[in-house]
Curated annotation (Swiss-Prot):
<comment type="similarity">
    <text>Belongs to the FAD-dependent oxidoreductase family.</text>
</comment>
<keyword id="KW-0274">FAD</keyword>
<dbReference type="InterPro" id="IPR041364">
    <property type="entry name" value="Rbx-bd"/>
</dbReference>
<keyword id="KW-0285">Flavoprotein</keyword>
<dbReference type="InterPro" id="IPR023753">
    <property type="entry name" value="FAD/NAD-binding_dom"/>
</dbReference>
<dbReference type="InterPro" id="IPR036188">
    <property type="entry name" value="FAD/NAD-bd_sf"/>
</dbReference>
<dbReference type="Pfam" id="PF18113">
    <property type="entry name" value="Rbx_binding"/>
</dbReference>
<dbReference type="InterPro" id="IPR023961">
    <property type="entry name" value="NO_rdtase_NorW"/>
</dbReference>
<keyword id="KW-0520">NAD</keyword>
<keyword id="KW-0560">Oxidoreductase</keyword>
<comment type="pathway">
    <text>Nitrogen metabolism; nitric oxide reduction.</text>
</comment>
<dbReference type="Pfam" id="PF07992">
    <property type="entry name" value="Pyr_redox_2"/>
</dbReference>
<protein>
    <recommendedName>
        <fullName>Nitric oxide reductase FlRd-NAD(+) reductase</fullName>
        <ecNumber>1.18.1.-</ecNumber>
    </recommendedName>
</protein>
<comment type="function">
    <text>One of at least two accessory proteins for anaerobic nitric oxide (NO) reductase. Reduces the rubredoxin moiety of NO reductase.</text>
</comment>
<dbReference type="GO" id="GO:0016731">
    <property type="term" value="F:oxidoreductase activity, acting on iron-sulfur proteins as donors, NAD or NADP as acceptor"/>
</dbReference>
<dbReference type="GO" id="GO:0005737">
    <property type="term" value="C:cytoplasm"/>
</dbReference>
<dbReference type="InterPro" id="IPR050260">
    <property type="entry name" value="FAD-bd_OxRdtase"/>
</dbReference>
Length: 382
């Protein structure tokens, strides 16, 4: 019997890959190594647990054991892979060596916590996994005032959800506007106004200097001298790919594990996908590229030829009171055709040569997102 495919990780990317492989081959041996219990859950739901009053248990779609049985895989739960021996094609976990025919890193990313001072740093929570929500669930349910570090996609979604659930919320963001790396200024400003309508306090151009325990509360000091007393601190300041084991194994690693359009790393027997993978220089921490990557990699693993082609992809900012959808490429040099109304915004980006390169739609105009995406895809293909 040939050595199995080994997958390190049990998040969305890993399980999407298993499902894609099983559609092609019901019997090829697969082993999954995961540091947690391997439960299947929908990670984007973590941004909306407070308004829906969901517990960590509510988010579980399937236990790790049930997933393993349904998809005919061997699950090594609570088993951390310590090393990869590339010459021997083995992974080392709990002091044992496990051989592989092909190895897949689906190790995801961890929440980035910016450097801060103070004796309250151990109380700073993150919400990047089911296990992190399990740890944060009780403190956050008791908290009246929550400070969110980070005004990017996840930070904004969580802040609005916390406010919708009745909590006082302060967002600290080092950039001059929210979603600075994703949205043009004329879209970010109405979003900020919507958040403030929900009572959310915004501290832009700011960063947290220190978190200090003060009885039952946390004293927050910003770099500009402002201070807050809050009940909880939640950090949503971005992600850092989990690459330590890959780097130690000698694989090419930059911001993520470097892969080509076949998801192959610098080792011909090792692949990577999901939040840990850097695809031809790009980090793509969204669901659609992971699904497309899983389909391509599944074919590779069963001996078929496939190559990842990424079409223009939609990004949704799931802020119910002011929904935003966008796709394509735009930059400070882009020219914008903008349609403004009380119901929302339709904005189309053009290159200096006049080519349609991307769009942003908000409010009631999100219904125009898919026709615009179709138009963008046709131009990209054509």
């Amino acid at each position: 019997m040939s050595d199995p495919i080994i997958i390190i990780g049990s998040g969305f990317a890993a399980y999407q890959l298993v499902k894609s492989v099983r559609r092609l081959d019901a019997h090829i041996p697969i082993q999954i190594f995961t540091a947690d219990d391997g439960a299947e859950y929908n990670k984007p739901d973590l941004s909306h647990v407070f308004s829906k009053r969901q517990t960590a248990a509510d988010l579980v779609v399937k236990s790790g054991e049930a997933f393993a049985e349904e998809y005919n895989v061997q699950l090594h739960a609570h088993t951390q892979v310590e090393r990869v021996l590339t010459q021997q094609q083995q992974v080392v976990a709990n002091g044992r060596c496990y051989p592989y025919s092909k190895l897949v890193f689906a190790t995801g990313a961890q929440a980035f916590v910016p450097p801060m001072r103070g004796d309250g740093l151990a109380k700073v929570m993150t919400l990047n996994s089911l296990q992190e929500y399990q740890a944060a669930e009780q403190p956050l349910s008791r908290a009246q005032h929550v400070l969110v570090i980070g005004g990017g996609l996840i930070g904004v979604e969580i802040a609005l959800d916390l406010a919708t659930s009745g909590k006082q919320v302060t967002v600290v963001e080092p950039n001059a506007r929210l979603l600075a790396n994703l949205l043009p200024e004329f879209i970010a400003l109405p979003l900020e106004q919507q958040l403030m309508k929900h009572g959310i306090q915004l501290a832009l151009n700011s960063r947290v200097e220190s978190v200090t325990e003060q009885g039952q509360t946390l004293a927050i000091a910003l770099h500009d001298g402002r201070e807050f007393a809050v009940d909880a601190v939640l950090c949503a300041a971005g992600l850092k790919a989990n690459t330590a084991v890959a780097r130690e194994a000698g694989l090419s690693v930059e911001r993520g594990i470097c892969v080509d359009h076949q998801l192959n790393t610098s080792d011909p027997h090792i692949y990577a996908l999901g939040d840990c993978a850097q695809i031809e220089g790009r980090m793509l921490p969204y669901l659609q590229p992971i699904v497309l990557s899983a389909n391509v990699l599944a074919k590779q693993l069963v001996g078929q030829e496939a190559r990842l082609t990424l079409p223009p992809m939609m990004v949704k900012v799931k802020t119910p009171s002011y929904p935003i959808q966008l796709a394509g490429d735009f930059s400070p040099e882009s020219h914008w055709q903008v349609q403004l109304s009380p119901e929302g915004i339709v904005a189309k980006a053009q290159s200096p040569l006049g080519d349609f390169t991307g769009f942003v739609v908000t409010g009631e105009y999100v219904t125009q997102a898919f026709p615009l995406l179709r138009e963008l895809s046709q131009r990209a293909n054509g």
